[in-house]
From Swiss-Prot:
Keywords: Amino-acid biosynthesis, Branched-chain amino acid biosynthesis, Chloroplast, Magnesium, NADP, Oxidoreductase, Plastid. Pathway: Amino-acid biosynthesis; L-isoleucine biosynthesis; L-isoleucine from 2-oxobutanoate: step 2/4; Amino-acid biosynthesis; L-valine biosynthesis; L-valine from pyruvate: step 2/4. The keyword Amino-acid biosynthesis applies. The keyword Amino-acid biosynthesis applies. This is Ketol-acid reductoisomerase, chloroplastic. Its cofactor is Mg(2+). Tetramer of similar but non-identical chains. The lineage of its organism: Eukaryota, Viridiplantae, Streptophyta, Embryophyta, Tracheophyta. One of its GO terms (molecular function) is ketol-acid reductoisomerase activity.
Amino acid sequence: FYEKEGLPAFPMGK
C-alpha cells in the first residue's frame, strides 16, 4: 500500500 489512499505506508517492495 502507499500513502496515497490515506493508508499507512507498509514496508513493501513498491
